Amino acid sequence: MPRKLFSKMPTTQGRSFYEELRGHDSEGYDGGSRAGLLDEENLNHNFQDYDLDHAEGLTVDDSRATLAGLRKTPASKVPPGHQNDRSMWLAHDDDADNDVPPSLLVEPRGAHLAGKPKRKQSRQAAYTMPGSSNTRAQWETIQAHQPLHNDEPFTQSHRGNGAPGSLFSGSASLDAKKMAEWRWANVQNLDKFIKEVYDYYRGCGIKAIITERVLHLGNVAFIAVLLTFLTQCVDYSLVRGSQKLSQIIVPQCTRKMSGWWNLGLWLFAFYFIWKAIQYILDLHRLFHVRDFYTHLLNIPDHDMQTITWQEVVARVMALRNQNSKTATTLTPLQRHFIGSQSKERLDASDIANRIMRRENYLIALFNKDILDLTIPLPFLRNRQYFSRTLEWTLMFSVLDMVFDEKGQVNQKFLRADRRGEISEKLRSRFQFAGIMILVLSPFVSLYLVIYYFLMYYHEIQKNPSVLSSRSYTPLAEWKFREFNELPHLFQKRLDMSKAFATHYMDQFPKVKTEMVAKSVAFVSGALATVLAIASVFDPELFLGFEITPDRTVLFYTAIFGSIWAVAHGMQSQDDVVFDPEYAMRNVIEYTHYEPDHWKDRLHSYDIKLEFAELYKPKIVIFLEEILGILTTPFVLFFSLPKCSDQIIDFFREFTLHIDGLGYVCTFAEFDFKKAMANAKKPSDGGDVRDEYYSAKHGKMEASYYGFIGNYGNFALNPKGAPGSHLPPGMRNQFHPPPAWPGLNSPPLGADMQTSRMGRSEFRSRSRAPGQGLRPGPSMVAPSPMASILLDPHHLPPSHLVNPGRASHPHRVQQNRRPGESNIIEESLEDEERGREGVNRHDDEEVYGHGDGMDESAWQTSPARTLSRDNSAIEGTGTAEAGVVDMIYQFNQAQFTRNGV
């Protein structure tokens, strides 16, 4: 609705700004980036006949298109929006293309593509049988009696995106699975479809979604009826002397309501009817998504509450692999569409990018501190303010303007010459949003107060301590959230951190406060004890004796008892250790938020005050939400318009286009091939440019390792381990104790030479033969292929997973005790090699044989890797190695020599 209002505003150019954006997108213009550039992707593509429909004006003259050919083209044959693109291609044509022999030309010099009739004649000529006249006559006779198949180009149906005619003709006999397959093959907006799949997952199935919507309408209707009855249909002046409800009810109260209340009821009726119709019309889409889960992903509706999102992603990837791309003949319009809607980009990273395309930009805006959220008041200028209301206005003012209906970034936001115009439009949107908040603030604030009062009153009455419970503020949630982190995964991480955050906040203040609390508890407890003992000897005194006028012993006993309870609650328990730094580190393990100025200061009181602004009592957050409806217009009118230029520059400089995925935030596209290499390099600070184009507070590293941990690559990020969001080199390594008793024990050493005792049938296949349990980090790291939710182009290189994974025999010999070198277990090693062969065969069956994979280093056994240290020792085995093994050994030697 607001977007349409903006589009109707008059402009000096005759067309509104938003009409230009829509017209610009429909033409398929790529922000000026196509000018002067060759389409290298389609340079060697096999174009078909219907591709020439878009190039009727091209003249084959010396193997290039000429301007003369364009002048001969009728105006009606040129599609709109293609003239400028064609001129750009012609302006940058290279003269070297003229050196083509005439024999290699498709048509002789001077030939002209006259249209479809000539192409049809050329195809008929291609069927002519070469040879003598008798042979050609026989061929024509056979062709007349048995004509060849019709090779006419495929023409798109005029029904648009509807099902094929064969499907419609037999729709009565089609089952739901075939229709689900057809809808999956004809998805037009992949971003929208993936979001629908994710929303269906979060809603726990169609039954839960419908139930939630019906109950929502019922709750809203109940609130409206209850408020109308309590405010308009009850005469409270008659309550004191009445005995029945009918005595205080106003007859025909609906006819006596005020005009404002009637207006509110009409608005409620409009909202109720609008939501009901919306829910009813949305049932068709819900059933389609249900069929997608049930028939294509094999996930029934009753499993939606227990299945994990990672399993859903794995099944979507398997479905994509079953329906691989087979079309090799695409029109330019279809290629432009596939540029952002390709189903080939559907692994865990791509799915998260499609769902979080808009939110990733907002996360980066908060991380880069681009948004000015201060209130322009003298006593609140240095305090950032953010509420849900302001979050909604940012979604409307910024994101709805940047992204089009297809979910892609508007091209004109990427052009520097439109910076001033777009910035002015953004300021006007901020001001319009502020006006709308001022108009709707009375209704919204009243609804929130009544809704939360009715919801939490009973809980507060039963458990008053709920008022002191804390939660993260909306600003803290956007600061803690990571790139490509889906909402349910982020909420899970926050919920796990709240217990540690509460424990941290309970440690402040302590010493002086506990001293005062102990004194108050002692005095109040002593007085309450004296009054209680006196009431035991004389119960009548307890009820009737007045210590002060109209205040009996019972009253003061209750007062002193309450004071003692409050003072005792302010004291820490005896078994609680005061260590704020340790408590804050536990919080950071889950929030992944540690600004640079927090380092080495986690114990300070300043850090506690800063964290208290992010973790506030729920009652304070609720009051800020109510007041935020009144203060948000000040931020929209005065603070945010000042940073509109920086916002436009941010979208232009931090937007990246990925083939098959579209435009995404640069921070959201994880460079898996460089992340681990950068994590192992010491940070040298960098220059100002690197600091500007990088995320703050380690957000990129935390997002990368958090993503790897969420989607199951335990080789890079063990799930649930302390410091799991940190790089492997920054986590504390586990050092197992040595075996006991030692192998140098004479009785044990003698027995082990002739015995097979102590061998386990469940030994890890990743441990090298002969490598015992010893102190230090693990020698062999699992393969990065442990994550099946990433495509090969997203997997990190194998040599970056664990550069020290190769075994070093001389180090093993140094750690052995004097009697261990005499122990020989040749039969054990032979059996271990046989088991490795079986395990390697099992891995090939699970992951395939590596066809089409970018990295092939993991095709060899991790336990048999070579390095510069052990290449000489195992030199006898290299003579029988194949070409792949020799290349692998050479790469490992190079990486080891470089110290990677």
UniProtKB/Swiss-Prot annotation:
It is a multi-pass membrane protein. Residues 111-134, 723-873 are annotated as: Disordered. Residues 235-262, 546-551 are lumenal. The keyword Transport applies. It comes from the Eukaryota. Its main location: membrane. Phosphorylated by ATG1. ATG1 phosphorylation is required for preautophagosome elongation. GO terms for biological process: autophagy of mitochondrion; lipid transport; piecemeal microautophagy of the nucleus; protein localization to phagophore assembly site; reticulophagy. GO terms for cellular component: autophagosome; cytoplasmic vesicle membrane; endoplasmic reticulum membrane; Golgi membrane; phagophore assembly site membrane. It is found in: Preautophagosomal structure membrane; Cytoplasmic vesicle membrane; Golgi apparatus membrane; Endoplasmic reticulum membrane. It catalyses: a 1,2-diacyl-sn-glycero-3-phosphocholine(in) = a 1,2-diacyl-sn-glycero-3-phosphocholine(out); a 1,2-diacyl-sn-glycero-3-phospho-L-serine(in) = a 1,2-diacyl-sn-glycero-3-phospho-L-serine(out); a 1,2-diacyl-sn-glycero-3-phosphoethanolamine(in) = a 1,2-diacyl-sn-glycero-3-phosphoethanolamine(out); a 1,2-diacyl-sn-glycero-3-phospho-(1D-myo-inositol-3-phosphate)(in) = a 1,2-diacyl-sn-glycero-3-phospho-(1D-myo-inositol-3-phosphate)(out). Pfam families: ATG9. Keywords: Autophagy, Cytoplasmic vesicle, Endoplasmic reticulum, Golgi apparatus, Lipid transport, Membrane, Phosphoprotein, Transmembrane, Transmembrane helix, Transport. The chain crosses the membrane at residues 214-234, 263-283, 525-545, 552-572. Residues 832-852 have a biased composition (Basic and acidic residues). Residues 857-870 have a biased composition (Polar residues). Phospholipid scramblase involved in autophagy and cytoplasm to vacuole transport (Cvt) vesicle formation. Cycles between the preautophagosomal structure/phagophore assembly site (PAS) and the cytoplasmic vesicle pool and supplies membrane for the growing autophagosome. Lipid scramblase activity plays a key role in preautophagosomal structure/phagophore assembly by distributing the phospholipids that arrive through ATG2 from the cytoplasmic to the luminal leaflet of the bilayer, thereby driving autophagosomal membrane expansion. Required for mitophagy. Homotrimer; forms a homotrimer with a central pore that forms a path between the two membrane leaflets. This is Autophagy-related protein 9. It comes from Podospora anserina. The lineage of its organism: Eukaryota, Fungi, Dikarya, Ascomycota, Pezizomycotina.
